[in-house]
Amino acid sequence: MAMTYHLDVVSAEQQMFSGLVEKIQVTGSEGELGIFPGHAPLLTAIKPGMIRIVKQFGHEEFIYLSGGILEVQPGSVTVLADTAIRGQDLDEARALEAKRKAEEHIKSSHGDVDYAQASAELAKAIAKLRVIELTKKAM
């Protein structure tokens, strides 16, 4: 039997996941993180993107995170997300429209603030589309 640890993924609205996992993959403030059983304690910010959860027995789940905090403790990991949406609950048409609008804003931005905000919106839309794509493949 594979080694596991307990994972909780919660947002301000609801608890998205609670259970035993073999590993997770998430984007932290310093880059990609793979958290396996026995990982050293860690507290870090999470960038907008996805969390890839490999549950006990190898089943995968993908959740979009708009940002948040990751805490790793012996035997348990907690993700406190600003916003969390399961891959199957994301609207592909809406994400494509958000991506298109963000690309338009980037082209028409007139200052650093406009560009930074549009870039952040584009990154979120691309992350949502990636979660949708991976969720479809996993089904």
Curated annotation (Swiss-Prot):
Subcellular localization, as worded in the UniProt entry: Cell inner membrane
UniProt-recorded Gene Ontology molecular function terms: ATP binding; proton-transporting ATP synthase activity, rotational mechanism
Annotated Gene Ontology cellular component terms: plasma membrane; proton-transporting ATP synthase complex
Its membrane topology: Peripheral membrane protein
Cited InterPro entries: ATP_F1_dsu/esu_C_sf, ATP_synth_F1_dsu/esu, ATP_synth_F1_dsu/esu_N, ATP_synth_F1_esu_C, ATPsynth_dsu/esu_N
Signal peptide: none
Keyword Ion transport on entry: yes
UniProtKB keywords: ATP synthesis, Cell inner membrane, Cell membrane, CF(1), Hydrogen ion transport, Ion transport, Membrane, Transport
Its job: Produces ATP from ADP in the presence of a proton gradient across the membrane.
UniProt xrefs under NCBIfam families: ATP_synt_epsi, PRK00571.1-4
Record family assignment: Belongs to the ATPase epsilon chain family.
Subunit comment: F-type ATPases have 2 components, CF(1) - the catalytic core - and CF(0) - the membrane proton channel. CF(1) has five subunits: alpha(3), beta(3), gamma(1), delta(1), epsilon(1). CF(0) has three main subunits: a, b and c.
Protein name: ATP synthase epsilon chain
Organism, scientific name: Enterobacter sp. (strain 638)
Organismal lineage: Bacteria, Pseudomonadati, Pseudomonadota, Gammaproteobacteria, Enterobacterales
Gene name of the encoded protein: atpC
